From Swiss-Prot:
PANTHER family: ELONGATION FACTOR TU, CHLOROPLASTIC (PTHR43721:SF5), ELONGATION FACTOR TU-RELATED (PTHR43721). One of its GO terms (molecular function) is GTPase activity. GTP hydrolase that promotes the GTP-dependent binding of aminoacyl-tRNA to the A-site of ribosomes during protein biosynthesis. It is found in: Plastid, Chloroplast. This is Elongation factor Tu, chloroplastic. Residues 10-214 form the tr-type G domain.
Amino acid sequence: MAQEVFQRTKPHVNIGTIGHVDHGKTTLTAAITMTLAVNSTCTPKKYDEIDAAPEERARGITINTAHVEYETASRHYAHVDCPGHADYIKNMITGAAQMDGAILVVSAADGPMPQTKEHILLAKQVGVPSIVVFLNKEDQVDDEEILQLVDLEVRESLINYEFPGDKVPVVAGSALMALQALTEKPNTLRGENKWVDKIYELMDAVDSYIPTPKRDIEKPFLMPIEDVFSIQGRGTVATGRIERGILKLGDIVELIGLNEKIRSTVVTGLEMFRRLLEQGFAGENIGVLLRGIEKKDIERGMVIAQPGTIEPHTRFEAQVYILRKEEGGRHSPFFAGYRPQFFVRTADVTGVIEAFEYDNGDKTRMVMPGDRVKMIVNLICPIAIEKKMRFAIREGGRTIGAGVVLQILDSTQLKSKNK
């Protein structure tokens, strides 16, 4: 059967459900797809279809994630739901499904729980820009005051982790009651059932409060170099996939990483699948011919970027998940001073792990497989890194961890330019 062509008629937003185990994340995901299926071509998903999540691999780590899609009147959404708590942590740190926004599900009967707060913190660390709250299980709460207390408590938790808790939309409802109504009458329309209406109200809040993300094409140009070769009589060609932005013939670009010099050069040729291009766009695999650059000046792991938009650094703080033995990770702990390989974009660089600490600020000398820690890393040579970047940690050919850069620590702007 021929594959259907994806018609992009509405802005696309990636979203996910976060929150404590058993507060109703997967039930809500099912209720949203069934509610919105009435007005769109997207397929409704039952709870057990979402809960039997397929395995994904991101940066060498297996993650159980379920992806569903749905549409509102104004947007197309891709929604990720992870059944297990560990899967959430791995998904958010590896960026297997990067979220433009999240729906935080909190049981109105229980209020915020430890995992609720952990997910809010993690959302902040990995750069989820906006959160909308769904107070689930409203049908189990008889007292309006309890609902108001939980609302207040959730807002305080969000403020504690630097989200604008006083402005965040909070919608109370019952995913299970909505799901039951939709199971009995699949084409329930707005205004026909109070619980289904709450799902519409939630999606109205998501539509209006979570901003449409800036598309990669609008960002400054950057391409990690995958391979380099010489064309006799023409010069040096670097190949790779454009991560963001647009590259045009005649553009001035910088070569950054693996040494302290930032070289400046001009793009004299662009090609894709052996066809000449006037310009290359984010997501495309291209070859770039660079003026006055010899093969020895450029290698895999460097990036080609719009001048002044990214710099080489060696030292950074990161949030890292260390794989358990069962996930193919280490069998034993490691200590400060450990020197694994860091895979950042196409670069593969040795780094020294100088220090660790847990989210509560407790320092530790030893990290166990399965831990999630902050660490300070010092690479042996500078590479183009920036906040929110993802990376893998490897040792002896296997992935032992995955991380996201929280902040750059070295202040040395390695800008001895050689133009």
